[in-house]
Every structure is written in structure tokens, then in C-alpha cells.
Regions:
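Short intrinsically disordered terminal tails
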Residues: 1, 25-26
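Bacterial N-terminal signal peptides
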Residues: 9-20
């Protein structure tokens, strides 16, 4: 009798665990993009190899993502619109437009990533608890205005 009780309890626990949603994930990490006066100007959903960028109301603006190229991996910026246009790339803590013009610098500490204009003016910051390179590049793309329609 005792053996049956243990067996029933085991199966009940197993069924309970199997019934839990498997979508429970720590990703995306969510962070606010702060402007030069430390007020929120946008949102970032950060994944391991890309970041989704949004307006404060959740409207998609674009994405920064690693892409495998012949020379390795590069970060590319894509504007979210009807064309999903490539608008720039990030490399060596710098953000460039499609034509190769330097648009912003970015750097990070343990928790914060900072974005600067080419003249050194601070454009803003974002709290990046993980995946700091892609997170900082995403904030740079958002703050430099590269996701705005031309």
C-alpha cells in the first residue's frame, strides 16, 4: 500500500511538472534607453545575439543583430518598416551608417552602456546586465537616429 502511494505521488508530480509551460525563459532582458537627460526615450528587448528596439509605447523601430559574413560576425542595424532596410553596422564600439559615416561611439561598464556623438556629446545610456556589446550597439542605433525614416 505504501509503495502505491509513493508511485501515485511520483506520477502526480511528474504530470504537474510536464504540464508547466515550457516557454518560461529569462529572455528577453528588457531595458529602457535613456536620453541625455536620463529620461526614457525608447525600449530594448535584449537577446543573446540581437536586440529589438522600440518606442516607449512598444512600436517596433528596428533591430541590431549579429550576421555571419565571410570575414566572421558583424553587427548590422535594420529599420523595422515595410522594406526592413539595412541602415548601418556596428564595429569596434562604433556605429556607422550604410555609406560608412561614423554616427556614434559606444562603450560599457559592468552595468551601464553609454553612447556618444562623434563630437563627444553624450547621447544617452542603457542598463545592460548581459550581452553588453549588442545591447550597447542597439542603444547607439536608437539614440543616433539611424532607425528614423529618411
Amino acid at each position: 500500500m505504501k509503495n502505491n502511494s509513493v508511485r501515485i505521488a511520483f506520477w502526480m508530480v511528474l504530470i504537474f511538472i510536464a504540464g508547466l509551460p515550457m516557454s518560461g525563459s529569462a529572455l528577453p532582458l528588457k531595458s529602457q534607453i535613456l536620453g541625455p537627460k536620463n529620461s526614457p526615450v525608447g525600449l530594448a528587448h535584449i537577446y543573446i545575439d540581437y536586440v529589438e528596439l522600440m518606442e516607449l509605447d512598444g512600436t517596433a523601430k528596428g533591430r541590431v543583430s549579429f550576421v555571419k559574413t565571410q570575414s566572421g560576425f558583424e553587427l548590422f542595424v535594420v529599420r523595422k518598416d515595410e522594406k526592413n532596410e539595412w541602415t548601418g553596422r556596428a564595429s569596434n564600439r562604433r556605429l556607422y551608417g550604410v555609406e560608412g559615416k561614423l554616427l556614434a561611439f559606444y562603450d560599457w561598464t559592468t552595468f551601464w552602456s553609454y553612447v556618444y556623438a562623434p563630437d563627444g556629446t553624450r547621447l544617452g545610456q542603457i542598463k545592460c546586465l548581459a550581452f553588453r556589446g549588442v545591447c550597447a550597439a542597439g542603444a547607439a542605433a536608437y539614440l543616433a537616429g539611424i532607425l528614423e525614416k529618411q
